[in-house]
UniProtKB/Swiss-Prot annotation:
Its main location: cytoplasm. It holds the Pfam family zf-MYND. GO terms for molecular function: histone H3K36 methyltransferase activity; histone H3K4 trimethyltransferase activity; protein-lysine N-methyltransferase activity; RNA polymerase II complex binding; zinc ion binding. Keywords: Chromatin regulator, Cytoplasm, Metal-binding, Methyltransferase, Nucleus, S-adenosyl-L-methionine, Transcription, Transcription regulation, Transferase, Zinc, Zinc-finger. One of its GO terms (cellular component) is cytoplasm. This is N-lysine methyltransferase SMYD2-A. The lineage of its organism: Eukaryota, Metazoa, Chordata, Craniata, Vertebrata. PROSITE patterns: SET, ZF_MYND_1, ZF_MYND_2. It is found in: Cytoplasm, Cytosol; Nucleus.
Length: 430
């Protein structure tokens, strides 16, 4: 099993392990692909996507026993059985009470795979799952308690089919999954599932990444979004890059236990535009701005929690009230305004309030293009959503323009032969 050409694992100064280019890669060029070591389709996409290959199609066939897993055909069903058998009978016996989290489901699959797979897999040419960083010593009590509740769920839902190692080994594995797991997303950045991609996990983070990770089914594809020269380290981004430096580093420290020293974090060059305030004849005081940033950070977190218990209408009202309040100090292109507009747009799409969704999307797209790096999937997916909204509302001229903007980014990020590209080209022919 050979390593991809033009790349090598190395010790990155101050960062630990990393991946380095040993030749040049052009913009849009594929560096390598990595099949998922294990993966799981998210509950809400059941019936829309095949549980095995993640293909999106109508008329998928149900598992005859549990009626909860869906497949393209018999081959996909057989391919998935080694993993689905961990859950099939438990789904039947627990019925509505079968509710392990996605992390628990993914970890159960890792344990099952490790039982049968003793050799290194094609997903581990640079880095093996056993080498994953866990940051166990850095976990606070809250994170440890979450892991313990995941372990309890693992015992509850999987004890018939999995024989566990001791508790300490499970804590270690869950900590590894929390730091090294990936979410698989579609072309509009909707969540499709969770997966482990060991070779992708080797790459270090930068807020100015030179590659982008996209997905073709359950395979990760890594392409250059800047020219890469021999000797350059290959950097991905672990987080959403919309936010200002302090927020990005808080998120990195909370999830991955480090802060970033990339060019963007050192210069904070984009922060003034990201945090721009209104130019008023009576400018707000420094304290007023500080208080509003604090309010904005709190409302972002509050909204994230509210999604689990509030109705869509209540969520939309929450967005509108916060936008009114922040709008007295922040300009519309301020990232906290954009964050709440994006949430509001999502609620409007869910409620099928197309005009409302369009209103927010139109305000978001221009600042997104400024705040995000070139060839950003966040920008591409926003153009795509807008294009599809325009087309649905029979505004074909402007819809065509928006879809073409999405296409221009995606041809670099996803590669010209990706099935998403073919689908969008088909939409442009209508």
């Amino acid at each position: 099993m050979g390593q991809p050409e033009g790349l090598e694992r190395f010790d990155s100064p101050g960062k630990g392990r990393g991946l380095k280019a040993t030749r040049s890669f052009a913009l849009g060029e594929l560096l390598f692909t990595c099949p998922a070591y294990t993966y799981v389709l998210t509950d809400t996409e059941r019936g829309n996507h095949c549980d095995f290959c993640f293909a999106r199609k109508e008329g998928l066939s149900k598992c005859g026993k549990c009626k909860q897993a869906f497949y393209c055909n018999v081959d996909c069903q057989k391919g998935d059985w080694p993993m689905h058998k961990l859950e099939c009978s438990a789904m039947c016996s627990y019925g509505q009470n079968w509710c392990p989290s996605e992390t628990v489901r993914l970890t159960a699959r890792i344990l099952a795979k490790q039982k049968t797979q003793t050799e290194r897999t094609p997903s581990e040419t640079f880095l093996s799952v056993k080498e994953f960083e866990s940051h166990l010593s850095k976990l606070d009590n809250e994170k440890k308690e979450l892991i313990e509740s995941d372990i309890a769920a693992l015992h509850r839902f999987y004890s018939k089919n999995l024989h566990y190692t001791d508790n300490a080994a499970l804590v270690f594995l869950f900590a590894q999954v929390n730091c090294n797991g990936f979410t698989i997303e579609d072309e509009e950045l909707s969540h499709l599932g969770s997966a482990i991609f060991p070779d992708v996990a080797l790459m270090n983070h930068s807020c100015c990444p030179n590659i982008i990770v996209t997905f073709k089914g359950t395979v990760a594809e890594i392409r250059a979004v800047q020219e890469i020269h021999a000797g350059d380290e290959v950097f991905t981004s672990y987080i959403d890059l919309l936010y200002p430096t302090e927020d990005r580093n808080d998120r990195l420290m909370d999830s991955y236990f480090f802060t970033c020293d990339c060019r963007e974090c050192s210069t904070k060059q984009k922060d003034p535009a990201k945090l721009e305030i209104r130019k008023l004849s009576d400018p707000p005081s420094h304290q007023t701005v500080k208080d509003m940033i604090k309010y904005a950070r709190n409302i972002v977190e509050e909204f994230r929690r509210a999604k689990h218990y509030k109705t869509p209408s209540e969520l939309l009202e929450m967005c509108e009230l916060s936008l009114d309040k922040m709008g007295s100090v922040f300009v519309d292109s301020n990232v906290y305004m954009l964050h709440m507009m994006y949430q509001a747009m999502g609620v409007c799409l869910y409620l099928q309030e197309w005009d409302g969704a369009l209103k927010y999307g139109e305000k978001i797209i221009k600042p997104y293009s400024k705040h995000y790096p070139a060839y950003s999937l966040n920008v591409a997916s926003m153009w795509l959503k807008l294009g599809r909204l325009y087309m649905g509302l029979e505004k074909t001229t402007i819809g065509t323009k928006a879809l073409k903007k999405a296409l221009a980014i995606m041809q670099i990020a996803h590669g010209p032969d990706h099935h998403y590209i073919a689908e969008i080209k088909k939409e442009l022919e209508l």
